[in-house]
């Protein structure tokens, strides 16, 4: 193993003769907490843990899983007793929120950490760099894809028009009213630049154009309403409902999160097909890419903190990143120097394609934003989308309600 390991073994200052425990908390995305067991037991962690154990044979890494919705309460209570975890694996907005609340520490920019940071794409680093410091160290990326039943469809539709034709032919497709699950359609229908500030609470210095944004939102919502009215379009509340519908054969096509692929591989086998999401009349889709980061616990001893930093840095080692990518085929490496073997893996080629679509979308989604903001706004957005899709609100009324959520000009998150 090359790259980071010499720095770890030479400079960490941790005694290898002392038996210690490193408590690592894994936090699944709130929308996929029903995959909690898969999240803890997946093979992704084994290459990292095996290599860490070779360097620190007397350190026991204790893995536990906590729900995202209860994380603030868990950490607040643990901190009051000085028993918080040493390391947390969370989404980048969650790390930003925890740092703002003082529940995690900023990543110290030591020489070894700066070496690790140099391995990252600047756009990924920008998602965790805040006024209080770096909220977390990126380790891998999860994407939004299209999953389909290969016994029902010979290939995935590449356009929304083709997707609607699938439904018209008698095959049922699934859509989600959950905002992140339907975010891909904002790009396809030309509304992602209008929706970006609403989601992240930051206009990124973009000069507001209210008439243009209102028109874009109306068009998007009208298009979603038209899709919902079509026969054989099943509107679900979230990824669990859609995933189970695909597994059972009731649905032929759904938008899906890459983190669900391990389960779908197990339940569907060769019936599972994976593709990038379809384009629309306004251009490419806007799939969301979730950046997973290590956040540093606030209650560690100096020795435990050095171990936590060592594990974080080791996770970016090229060989570890490559092993994680190849063993799961559902995440992409954060280390920009790791070549993803897209030529030999159709699954990884799809993931890389979805990541390119995300990077070509609005730059606002690559800014640091807080999970607290998202948790306040997304239920309102979901309610508006749901009411428009079932006809309770008109597209015009829905657009006006969404615009009420936008930040003031020049506002931060």
Residue positions per predicted region:
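Paired acidic/hydrophobic, glycine-rich loop segments that form the ligand-binding mouth/hinge
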Residues: 86-89, 252-257, 273
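Glycine-centered hinge/linker elements that transmit conformational signals in sensory
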Residues: 202-236
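Ligand-binding "clamshell"
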Residues: 98-106, 131-133, 192, 264-282, ...
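Extracytoplasmic/periplasmic substrate-recognition and gating elements
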Residues: 154, 266-332, 366
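Extracytoplasmic/periplasmic solute-binding protein
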Residues: 135-139, 144, 162-209, 251
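Conserved N-terminal structural module of periplasmic/extracytoplasmic solute-binding proteins
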Residues: 4-94, 405-413
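Long, aromatic- and glycine/proline-rich binding clefts that accommodate carbohydrate-like moieties
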Residues: 326-379, 387
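Hinge/lid segment of periplasmic solute-binding proteins
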Residues: 92-145, 155, 273-275
